[in-house]
Amino acid sequence: MNPHLLTHETADDYVRGMARVTQLVAQHLAADAPSTGATVADLTPAVEGVDLDRPAADLDAALAEVTDIYLRDAIWFHHPSYVAHLNCPVALPAVLAEGIIAAVNTSVDTWDQSAGGTLVEQRLIRWTAGRIGFGEGADGVFTSGGTQSNLQGLLLARGEAVRRAGSDATLRVLATEHSHFSVIKAARIMGLHPSAVIAVPTDETGGMSTAALAAELDGIRERGETAMAVVATAGTTDLGVIDPISTIADLAAAHGTWLHVDAAYGGGLLTSLRRRHLLDGIERADSVTVDFHKTFFQPVSSSAIVVRDGATLGHVTHHADYLNPRTAVTPNQVDKSLQTTRRFDALKLWLTLRVTGADAVGEMFDEVIDRAHQVREVLRDDERFEVAVEPVLSTVLLRYRPKGVGVTEADSLNPRIRHALLDDGSVMVAGTTIDGRAWLKFTLLNPQTSLAHLRGIIETIATTGEALRAEDELDELRVTAGSRGSGADALAPRPTMAGVTR
């Protein structure tokens, strides 16, 4: 017997080990903050001090080590005071599915490796396509995330554009400055010139200006170039804005241009009973990105690229005699995917739909969108804060700017507030820059984050900002006193901020 491998002979060890691991994680789920505030400098010595050439004494010793180097200081996305990035608490059935996925270790690249897994993935793709509004000819494949899904969508767009135009010399991709950066990365990977991605101006809502898009498409045609793709975003990362998909679809169709909808964030609306209309027009897309590991509450990774015409997936097909020969009777998933070996991530979504249900998933997303609108109303009555735009999804951009704080000072102060909160660890918010101005960002994906939690976070931000301003004023007094020769003892000791470091 080999004691190191999972077999029927080590099944008892497997059960005991999994019990130990689940108990360990369960203990940490009760963390009283989303972060410990540990820094790279704090964690590096422990990680570098591990001798990877010498194994630990046993599983318990190895797990204690994992606790020291990772688990104790992990960032807990399920904590209600985590409102930073597009990270969600995960559905319990999906976590349980992860255990099955890892133990069986299926690879869903070819039929002979994954008969049942292939059928499950294909069924989920058809289900997602139906929710989008695609017809019987739709198809797709699970991917590692929105970046890969967007890359594949644009690869297919290029394949179609080259098929029609006969050349890739003057291909152009139209997106906005708020589109995900993976659009530009995809263009680079495909070897397109940096000028190939055209930033279409946005309107006052932050969404793509359809008048500007029409002008850009006309200009491309007049210059003899080829509009390879228009990328509409259903939920921008910074603003949570949904581009006007229906009108964009009209323009793309009029110019014979591939329409890719990046619904990595907003795709959760496909299960919403109250807000599905926000995705109207998505059924006219040629390809759609959906990140289940965002608004379907799935563990990373779980995403998909879904296309209206499955035949277009042929642009990424390559046959290998040892794996997926042209003579194969049954199509293999590798024929559609950029990856070869690929985890059976679809099982997580399957088990979630079978236990939790699609309606409940949609309601959880609706709840966090509700919360974004509620916190917007709180901020509307709070003169200490500004809000960038009205929320559409679950993102709220705010910044601390009380009376007496100028625009430039606010641009400096708000990133400092964020870093102070990050150092403390009790609250985690994100930050970004819009039109050259610094903003804090609430990205709400946890239904357990109540309005009371958010009111508390707002007060923590304000208190931290006040303390930082007090420090700045004291620094100025010290500089002034020093320039007058008052000596080091001219002022009282500097006050400290509870839970805030610089």
Which role fits each region the language model picked out?
Residues D280-E383:
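Active-site C-terminal subdomain of aminotransferase-like
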Residues L353, L397-V407, S426-G456:
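Conserved PLP-binding active-site segment of the aspartate aminotransferase-like
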Residues S149-A311:
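Conserved PLP-enzyme active-site core in the AAT-like
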Residues E386-L421:
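Conserved PLP-binding catalytic core of the aspartate aminotransferase-like
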Residues G37, E386-P391, V429-T433:
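Short beta-strand
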Residues N2-G137, L422, V427, T449, ...:
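N-terminal entrance/gating region of PLP-dependent enzymes' catalytic architecture
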Residues I434-R502:
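PLP-dependent enzyme catalytic core of the Aspartate aminotransferase-like
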Residues T128-Q152, I198-P201:
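Short loop-beta-helix segment that forms the pyridoxal 5′-phosphate
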